[in-house]
Amino acid sequence: NTNKKLIMKGDYDYLKLLNISCVRIMKYDYLIVGSGLFGAIFAYEANKKGKKVLVVDKRPNVGGNIYTENIDGINVHKYGAHIFHTSNKEIWDYINQFAEFNRYTNAPVARYKNELYNMPFNMNTFNKLWGVVTPEEAKQKIEKEKNEAGIKEPKNLEEQAISLVGKTIYEKLVKGYTEKQWGKRATELPSFIIKRLPVRFIYDNNYFNDIYQGIPIGGYTQIIEKMLDGIEVRLSCDYFENKEELENIAEKIIFTGPIDKYYGYKFGELEYRSLRFETEELDVENYQGNAVVNYTEYEVPYTRIIEHKHFEYGPSLGKIAGGKTAQKTIITKEYPDKWIQGKEPYYTMNDEKNTSLYSKYKELADKDSKVIFGGRLGQYKYFDMDKVIIEALKCVKEELK
């Protein structure tokens, strides 16, 4: 009976051409949908415990959004900049078993018109804005602006931001960037989006407070490749386009795509913000002098420019393998984009409306013994990379007891 014949990988495409349907192509313990960090970690840990795993990904490469591609000796972050940071030594040690990390420190620069400011807001920023030198002078300046605004009960994001840092910082470094990111004017955005704005009264441009920080030497893709070594992976394989084959191929599914899409948008669409990237290779050795430059003017359509070589070269700028000099550079302009079905969802919109909608899908998922949802889309929450690892290892511990 060909419908129930067990066949080996590689035969499926042939049978598909002959229009022969197979109930069981191969039997797996877990089908993992998505080869990003969450899916790859689960696959790696399950494989170590002797579980039979199949990983599928709709993209032609592994790695999800942390995928990096080496172009002319430069590791390009294809889906936006990713800087690993954590204060959890266990998580730092875990990720370091797959790659050696450099000592990159995230110190973005904000550009407003032709003025450049250090981020996050610190004494270097305040000195450039007002000429103040001491922390006390900076505090007085910010408090004066907050008092002048007189906002006691912020009604929108604009009022909330001004009540936290004053008008000058808000107008130059917050307003335009935030409006581009959300696709709405700040006066139309709810105040709860900005609960706090970090202000540091020290001369320190390190964006993160975490103890451990860096970029893997050689890029992120190698990490995922090592995790998936020896595991069957099918690329350019969209779960939804191959659902008939895949839905009964394994005992359980680890699903890292959008939870609402998995359930056919039963309760309606969750909202996201998307991104669009424009990448250029330039015939200059050093374009902007920093890995990340944020553009805070609303009139500039992109939110930031990434110069990828600066993530890894640091003091030895321009040096690639063998000590040769990279005479070119690669930059990426990042444009916030409205999300519609068919576009890549990057940022979850965790407002009251969407949180309420997600809770309905979560309730459905909790009753579903066939599937486990993971990652930012499966759990509808923005995660830094260290938090993804924590969630994935938690899932492994609970599932593979």
Predicted feature locations:
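Short, well-ordered alpha-helix to beta-strand connector turns
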Residues: 28, 50, 231, 249-251, ...
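Dinucleotide-binding Rossmann-like beta1-alpha1 core, especially the glycine-rich loop
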Residues: 72-147
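Mid-domain catalytic core of redox enzymes
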Residues: 12, 49, 239-364
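Glycine-rich FAD pyrophosphate-binding loop
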Residues: 47-71
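Extreme N-terminal leader/targeting segments of oxidoreductases
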Residues: 4-30, 48-49
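N-terminal Rossmann-like FAD-binding beta1-loop-alpha1 element of flavoenzymes
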Residues: 30-55
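Active-site/ligand-binding neighborhood in enzyme catalytic cores
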Residues: 113-117, 123-252, 256, 261-263
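C-terminal catalytic lobe of FAD-dependent flavoproteins
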Residues: 344-401
